Amino acid sequence: MAEKILFYIYRDSGTSSENLVRAIVDEFKNFVFRDRGIAFTSKGYSGIPLLGELPIDSPLDDIWKVVAVLFKISAREEGLIFKVHTTDYEKNPLVAEAKKSDVLPNWAHSVKDFAENVFGMNGVIHLISPTVSEKFPKRSQIDILRAVPNETRNILVTESLSEKLHSSESRNFGMHNTSVNVPVSMAYVARERPDILSLAIREFVKTDERKIKELEKRLANEHDRVMIHTIINDTDWKEVTAVADIESPTDIVSHRVSLALLAFDEKHSSIPNGVDVPVSGLFQKVGDRFEREHLEALRAKLFGSPQSATHLYQCAKSLVTGNHVQECRKIFVDEGSTSNRESDCSGNEDDSSNAKYAKKQVFKKKKRNAFGKKRELAAILDHTKPSEHSEPDYVAPDNSAALKKFERAVNGDDYYKASSDEYSLGEEEDLELFMAKPRKKILEEMKNKNKARLGIKVTERLPTVSDDEEIDVADMLRAAPPIANAEDIEDFDDI
C-alpha cells in the first residue's frame, strides 16, 4: 500500500457535517490538483473525524493547498481542529517547515514528540507540551485543546509557516490566468470548468500527429470563436506552452487549447451516457444549474465518488444556455446589440414570466438626470492655423556691482575713497537718522524744544559716560615720556 499523508478533521457540535463539506468544496472549486488529489471519508457514527488521504509523493503545491485550506476553514469554523499525520515523521509538512526554521520547542527531544503533539485550530498552530498534558491526564488531546487553547497556541511555529500558507491561500495558487481564443460552442465550459479543461489538455498530450492534423483542419473551419479568460493548472500550462512549429507562435496557447477542446468534444460527445448520479442537495441554494452541477461533481470527486470524464462533460455542456454564451461574447459585442437577449439564464428553472420585465429594467433608456450634472466640454481648437508662440527675450542679469566688489577683494583694494562718489559706501551719511533713540531721550528733546519756544533757558546736560569710556589721568601720565634733566643733556641736539 502506498504511503499517504493523513488529515484528521475534528468538528464540534457547532459545525454540521453539511457545512463542513460545503466549505471544503467551495475552497477547492478553482483549484486543479496536479496528481490524483485528496479524498475524504467519514469515520465513526457521527462522521468525526473526517479523514483526508493524499499520496505522499504528491507535488508540494497539492500538499500545501490542502494544509492552507484546513487552516482557513479552522479560522472560520469555531471549534474545528485538524491534525496532519505521516508514517515517516520527517515527511510531515508541518514538521519539515518547523525544523527548517529551527523553531522546534525545547521539550520536543525528537521529531516524533513534535509531530504527535502539533495541531491546527483557530487558524494557528497549537502544541500540547508535557506540562499541559500532566494537568489533564485523563483527557484526550482534542479535549485538552478545547479546554485550554491559550496555553497550547504557539505563534512562533505559526510564523514559520506563514510564508507558505499566505501563498497557498491565494485564489489562483498553482494555476495560471490566461486568455484564449476558442470555439464558442465550448467557450463557457472552458471558462468556468477548469477541471474539464485540464482533462481535455491531458488527453490531448497523448494524441498522435495524424489526429492533430485532422483537428487543425477542423479548427480552420471554426469561424465562430470568442476570447475568454480562464485558469490552467501549472502542469497543463507547461504542455500548452511547449515549443511547436505552428503558423502563429504568439497564439500557441489558444491553438493548443482549441485543439484539445475539439478532440475532447469529439470523443466524449459520441459516447452514450445513461448514468444517473444522485444529487446530494447540499447546493440547492445555488441558482445557476451549471454552477450547481460543478459543485456536485467536485463534491463527488473529493468524497470518494469521482465521475467519468464523459459524464462530467456531457452534463456541463447540456447546461450551457444562450445567456452563458452571451457572457463570453460581451467583451466584443457592442452595448447596443440586441442579440441573444431573449435567452434565459439557467438559474431560472421555473417559469420565466418575469423575463421580459427584467430585460426591460436592464435595457430601458435612462433619463438624463440619472447621469448627474451635464458636463461642459472645452472649446474645440482649430489646429489648421496654429498660433505662433513668441518666446520672451532673455535678459542677462545686471551683476556689475557684485563683480566690482569681487575685483576689489581679489586685487587687495579693500579701502574706499570717501571723496569719490564712485567708491563711496555712505560713510559720511548721518547714521543717527537711522538709529533708534530711547523713549526717554525723545521726551526730553520735546520738552527742551517747548522751553526754547517759550523763552525758557535750557540747561544742557553732559552726556553720560560709561565705565569703558571714562578717562583715567594716571594712565595718561604713565603713557607720557619722562622729562629730561638739564645736566643729563650734553648736547641739545641729542634730543
UniProtKB/Swiss-Prot annotation:
GO terms under cellular component: nucleus
Region (Disordered): 337-360
InterPro entries for this protein: Ecd
Family matches, as Pfam families: SGT1
Stated name of the protein: Uncharacterized protein F19C6.2
Source organism (scientific name): Caenorhabditis elegans
